[in-house]
Structures are given as C-alpha cells and as structure tokens.
From Swiss-Prot:
HAMAP family, per database record: LuxS
EC number in record: 4.4.1.21
Origin species: Staphylococcus epidermidis (strain ATCC 35984 / DSM 28319 / BCRC 17069 / CCUG 31568 / BM 3577 / RP62A)
Function: Involved in the synthesis of autoinducer 2 (AI-2) which is secreted by bacteria and is used to communicate both the cell density and the metabolic potential of the environment. The regulation of gene expression in response to changes in cell density is called quorum sensing. Catalyzes the transformation of S-ribosylhomocysteine (RHC) to homocysteine (HC) and 4,5-dihydroxy-2,3-pentadione (DPD).
Protein's name according to its UniProt entry: S-ribosylhomocysteine lyase
Gene that produces this protein: luxS
Length: 156
C-alpha cells in the first residue's frame, strides 16, 4: 500500500477492533506546543456505523462537555465514515488521562436532558438530532471501557 498523506488512510481498518482510543498523531508547532490527535473509534470499520442523528447529537454533547473536564482540547470532530471521532489536545500527552476525560464526557452524555445548540441559529442541521441515539452510542462505548486501549483486539 502506498503511503498516504492522511494518517488514517495508512491505518489498516481490517486489523483494528472497535471500540478503542488510539493516538493517531502528533504535531509540534513553531513555539514547541504539541498537538496530540486521538482516534475515538465507536464502531467497527466497514461493519457498523453510527446513525447520523445520534452521531450529530453525540458530537454536540461531547464537544460542549469535554471542555468541562480539561482546558487542553483543541477540537473534537466526527469522522465522515460515521465510525468515530477525532479529538485533539494541546500539550497533553497523558493517554490514561485522555481515557478518563472521554469516560467523564460520555457519562455527561448519559446524564444530559437536552442536546446543546440544537437549534437553527447554532447548528447547521438542527433537524438531525437524537438525544436517545447519542445516549445509546455512549452507553455501548462505556460498556466496553476495558477494551479502549486494545486497538487490535489482542487482549492487552
């Protein structure tokens, strides 16, 4: 396989076992700041995907709530394949803490009574949301918390 510019295009999606959270890359800025990008894979690539309303609500809930647990988040974005999200942190390379931050954020999702910014002023497709869908996705991921660091399903 030819090396691609996009890191995830170099990942063999047939070898990974979701759910997992993996360090997908780092980038150092001119002033020494380091961005750590993590792949939060909720669904098995090419076998499952998140339905868009649930994914969309999960994005809103995670993007808003993760910042209550750390000031190191640069961005949280959904993958176009609908199998996961990317989250980027600045100057924060503690993998175990990242797992805990994601855990806390997903518990916030379970406790949510509404989707933040779920309106036409603050969202580009406000009609496409499902709080219950987001909660179902979050619970399924939390149910397999012990697998998050086992990217290839090796029982490690």
């Amino acid at each position: 396989m030819t090396k691609m510019n996009v890191e995830s295009f170099n990942l063999d999606h047939t070898k990974v076992v979701a759910p997992f959270i993996r360090l997908a890359g780092t980038m150092e800025g001119l002033n020494g700041d380091v961005i750590h990008k993590y792949d939060i894979r909720f669904k098995q690539p090419n076998k499952e995907h998140m339905d868009m309303p649930g994914l969309h609500s999960l994005e809103h809930l995670m993007a808003e709530n993760i910042r209550n647990h750390t000031d190191k988040v640069v961005d949280l974005s959904p993958m176009g394949c609908q199998t996961g999200f990317y989250v980027s942190f600045i100057n924060h390379d503690d993998y175990d803490d990242v797992l805990n931050i994601i855990d806390q954020t997903l518990h916030d999702v379970l406790n949510a009574s509404e989707v933040p910014a779920c309106n036409e002023v603050q969202c580009g497709w406000a009609a496409s949301h499902s709080l219950e869908g987001a909660k179902t996705i979050a619970q399924a991921f939390l149910d397999k918390r012990e697998q998050w660091n086992d990217i290839y399903g090796e029982g490690k």
